[in-house]
């Protein structure tokens, strides 16, 4: 199963995270690619559903993460991209996200994150492109 994670960057440089309702952990917005969708369309849709933000452009591919244990629910392959975003933060899908917040890169939450999102974020901050 293919999914996406988005590293949304606001015009002021802050990174937007959501708190997942299912496990209470901070996470990158994202989700599964729907039948008939390409990855950029999924990124745009999931970004709007989970944050209310609009995709301006996908800046770069951060990586492809495929470890069988990266998602506790299923074996999924996650395509991670940095995205320039605009708009007002507002959760659209309240079944998936309970909170939304923007963080400066030097003040990201230190608590554990959902799935392998801490690694994805660290790879991004280290300016890496990963195939894992």
Model feature map: region roles:
Residues 66-89, 124, 128-129:
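Active-site-adjacent beta-strand/loop module that shapes the phosphate/pyrophosphate-binding cleft
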Residues 24-26, 95-132:
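Nudix hydrolase/Nudix homology domain
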Residues 1-15, 82:
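Conserved N-terminal beta-strand and adjoining loop/helix that marks the start
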């Amino acid at each position: 199963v293919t999914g996406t994670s988005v590293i949304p960057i606001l015009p002021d440089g802050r990174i937007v995270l959501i708190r997942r309702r299912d496990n209470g952990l901070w996470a990158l917005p994202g989700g599964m690619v729907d039948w008939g969708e390409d990855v950029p369309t999924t990124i745009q849709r999931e970004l709007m559903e989970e944050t209310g933000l609009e995709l301006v452009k996908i800046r770069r591919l951060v990586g492809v993460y495929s470890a069988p244990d990266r998602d506790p629910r299923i074996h999924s392959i996650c395509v991670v991209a940095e995205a320039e975003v605009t708009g007002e933060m507002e959760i659209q899908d309240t079944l998936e996200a309970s909170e939304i917040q923007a963080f400066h890169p030097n003040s990201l939450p230190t608590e554990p994150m959902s799935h392998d999102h801490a690694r994805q974020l660290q790879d991004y901050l280290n300016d890496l492109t990963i195939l894992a």
